[in-house]
Regions:
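Polytopic transmembrane helical bundles with strong interfacial aromatic enrichment
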Residues: 1-114
């Protein structure tokens, strides 16, 4: 789990740089620069949370998988919409947001034993 979390952190930083340099003009032309930035921000925040949970060997695997799913669905759908213009992916984004909320709620109800 820690390797997955570390890879997700790596990808968040890489996608941030990719969007800021190589994709900047394309994203601005499509009016998707803000969506890309939001995707990177939420991706990185939740990847760090996954890393911390994995590092401390938490037994909250449900919360871990919900946060992981949130990255895939929320940030992933925004990345794909920004790159492809496929607006039909829009309804997937809030499902990812709900996964984030559910993962954090799980941690509130059942905090990890660090």
């Amino acid at each position: 789990m820690i390797r997955i979390a570390a890879a997700l952190c790596f990808l968040a930083v890489a996608f941030g740089a990719f969007g800021a340099h190589w994709l900047k003009a394309q994203l601005e032309e499509r009016h998707m620069a803000e969506a890309w930035h939001t995707a990177v921000l939420y991706h990185l925040i939740h990847a760090i949370a996954l890393f911390v949970l994995a590092y401390f060997g938490t037994t909250n695997r449900g919360a871990w998988w919900l946060l992981f799913s949130g990255i895939i669905l929320f940030s992933g759908s925004l990345y794909l919409m920004a790159l492809s213009g496929m607006r039909w992916l829009g309804p997937i984004t809030p499902i990812g947001g709900l996964c984030f909320l559910a993962g954090w709620a799980w941690l509130v109800i059942s905090p990890p034993k660090l």
